[in-house]
Structure formats: structure tokens, C-alpha cells
Amino acid sequence: VEYERFADGEHVVRVPEAVAGERATIVASTVDSDAHVQVLQLQDAAREAGATEVVTVVPYMGYARQDEAFRDGEPVSSRAMARAISTGTDRVITVNPHEPAVYDFFDVPATLVDAAGLLADPLPALSEPLFLSPDEGAIGLAHTVRDAYGAGETDFFEKERDYDTGDIEISTNGAPAEGRDVVLVDDIIATGSTMSESVAVLDDRDAGRVFVTCVHPMLASNALTK
């Protein structure tokens, strides 16, 4: 695929002519607004080039965390993006979206791929492992990684977010961490604030080694430093 950006900031893409009469599979993570536009252009270009079917694979679906209007006057952004993607494709495949409910927003068949189990592969031998998610919503990921590892306990932190300031407050839920190896599991690490605060809480509780894992390491700004 060829990409070009014009002086005014607009994009254009070009797909190989070989897609004529074939199924075109577009693989593109929508990590920012430009990427969303390029996906829509790729879909249209594939149709224009004669593809008989278009399958859109979105490993990371941007805006999936905005699955509801959190304040008056806000859109349901993930719904808007899903509808836009649906217009140019026959099927959508994506990996561990922040909220599985976003699949209801697509107007074409959508498939979820769960990659969380792969997070267990690089883990070393753990001592009394505890698999923790930063909030209750991600506990399923912790279960999946624990099951893939083959041993351990799961639990989650209580997390409260102030949608006006963006501040996050984290508190423990109950499972003892002292002296145990802890694996933190989440779907996305964006700014890193949640994970860094979780690590700090575990340090205060005298946990053993702490391993941070996620499916989608966005690592915006200074997240890696945190």
C-alpha cells in the first residue's frame, strides 16, 4: 500500500491492482484519527480496485473506551467509529476491545479475538502468583492469563476515575500480595497512570516481583517512564 500526505494535511492511499476479483483483507490499527481516515480510504480503494470482498482487521480499535456518553452533550464515539468502518467492509475482526459491547455498534458481522492468554508466554517461574487487573472490568483478562500460566490467584483493584479532571484513585480489593509475585493485567496502557499507581500500591504492600502486562501498549507521552 502506498500512502501520500498533501500539503493541506489530507491523505490518499493506493492499493495494488492485484486485489481485483479477490478478497481484500485490510489490517490497520486505528491508533489515531488519521488512521481512522486511512482505513476508510483503504476500504474504498479496495472496492474501487475490484475486490469481491473486504475484510477489515483492526487489532487495536481506537475510541473503544468511549462506549457511552459519560457527560451531557458527548457522543458515543465508539459507535460512530464502528458505523463508519461498517460502511466499507463485509466483516470486521478486532482484538480485545476495551468494551466487548462495541461489537453491537457494527452494522456488519464482527469477530473478537482474545489475545490475553499470550501474555503468559514470557512470564518466568512465579512464586505464589497473583494475577491482578486494575479494575473489576478487566478481571476476565486476569483469569485468562492465570489460566494460560496454569497456576495462581486472581483479584482486582478498585478504581475510580474523575471524568472532569481525568484523575484516577486506586485502592486494594483484598487479596494478600505480601511476598508474592504479582502480574498486573490490562487491555490497554495509555498514559500509564493506572499501572504506575497499581505498582506503587503493591510496593506499599510488600509484594515480591511485579510484572506489568497488557494487550495494547499505547504508551502515550511518558507512560513508559511512569
Outline where the language-model segments fall.
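PRPP-associated nucleotide enzymes
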Residues: 1-226
